Amino acid sequence: HLISNGLDNLLIEPDDVYEYLGEKTLLVIVDTHRQSFLETPELFDKVDRIVVIDHHRKGAHFINNPIFQYHEPQSSSASELVTELIFYQTSKVNVSEQVANFLLSGICLDTKFFKSGVSGKTFEMAMNLKNYQASVEAVNEYFKEEYEEMKLISGIVNSAKVLSPGIFMATSDEEDIITRTALSKAAEEILSTKGVQAVFVVGRTNN
């Protein structure tokens, strides 16, 4: 979505990041608190100043001694936590409309468009993002599937098999490379089926 919206300058290839590292480098880890879950785990050992923002329940092998940690398992998403940090600053933080929409899309993805895992704070943060012109209509555009992605998701959904009553597993074809977003969409589609309590979706990603 960043690339398609002209914000590819916000992205950097993992192999290129090391030339920007210095004594004052701050590494902000979002949506996980485990080093093994990082996209580039080897970067972790190159930086001394680390911030962790996550909403998942704390598991084993969590990151020790960050200089700042906001870990709130009762929040709907990491996007909700980031939004909360933005809006509770003593001085106003400028947020562009596109960034506000990206944050809202994170909330929508993790809550299945406010159908599960929401709280009063979730709605409050979504309303705050609307002050920066974020909208569910824009988020829907982000989530529109391209044809090839739609085929991959459909294949995963059709592969679902019962492990035990209410518990399912679905897999992608071995040769397919699947984005994490596509895996999440497939899981959500299966979970929306009556009688499904949990689903495990397995696929090969770029990493």
Stretches found by the model and what they are:
Residues D15-Y18, L38-E42, Q69-E72, K92-V93, ...:
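A generic local secondary-structure boundary/capping motif
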Residues K24-L27, D48-I50, F62-Q69, E84-K92, ...:
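Low-complexity, flexible helical/coil segments
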Residues L7-N9, V30-D31, K46-R49, Y70-P73, ...:
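Short, low-complexity, polar/charged sequence segments that are solvent-exposed and flexible
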Residues H55-A126:
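Short alpha-helices
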Residues H1-L7, Y18-T25, L104, C108, ...:
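Hydrophobic helix-and-loop "lid/oligomerization" segment in the mid-to-C-terminal part
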Residues G6-P66:
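Active-site cofactor/cluster-binding pocket
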